[in-house]
Amino acid sequence: LHVQMTREDNSYLQMLKQRAFINGLDLCGFSTHQGFVSPDVAVRQKNIDHTLHCLELAYKLGIPTMRVNTGRWGTTKNFDTLMENKGIEPRLEGHSDDQGFKWVIDSFEKCLKKAEELGVMMGLENHWGLGRTAEGVLRIVKAIDSPWLQVTADTGNFLEDQYRQFEMLAPQTVYVQAKT
């Protein structure tokens, strides 16, 4: 998980690779956080830049997939409240889900060239925000229609009708995060 890394210099990255190798572990998925659901162009650009940077880190670590997400409206400040509401939160006043999907799609499209150049596949996780449902994840992935943005399926994140939703995601799933 990127947020748990204490440093990002090359010697640290190579030490992580060495530790994984010595312990028989494959580094197969790099986990990051994005927040593209914002009317503020500067906020989206900051998250695009962060995503591009994380693609570079994944590449240096030899990791072929990187978990990405949409972000969320940010109108629910308390995580427990967000969970009580099953990840659903009110939109920012004056904005629509359609606008949010457009912002997310535009942002991921700006990351595709770097993902392809580095050979790191982005996997959009079924996480909170606009990726809370299989329909939301697939709306984004299918709109972009690139082999460099597919799906990371997280078994702990669908709160309703899990099997149907995983069945929908399966054809485009490149990575699974399994939880009990």
Question: Which residues does each PLM region occupy?
Answer:
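Active-site pre-Tyr helix/loop in NAD(P)-dependent dehydrogenases
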Residues: 33, 72, 158
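Gly/Pro-rich active-site loop or hairpin
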Residues: 134-138, 142, 148, 157-180
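Active-site acidic/histidine proton-transfer and metal-coordination neighborhood
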Residues: 13-14, 19-26, 37-150
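Short, solvent-exposed loop/turn segments at secondary-structure boundaries
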Residues: 5-8, 39-44, 164
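N-terminal, post-signal-peptide region of Sec/Tat-exported proteins
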Residues: 1-14
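Hydrophobic faces of well-ordered beta-strands that scaffold small-molecule active sites
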Residues: 1, 27-32, 66-68, 122-124, ...
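Glycine-/small-residue-rich active-site loops that bind phosphorylated ligands and cofactors
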Residues: 8, 129, 157-158
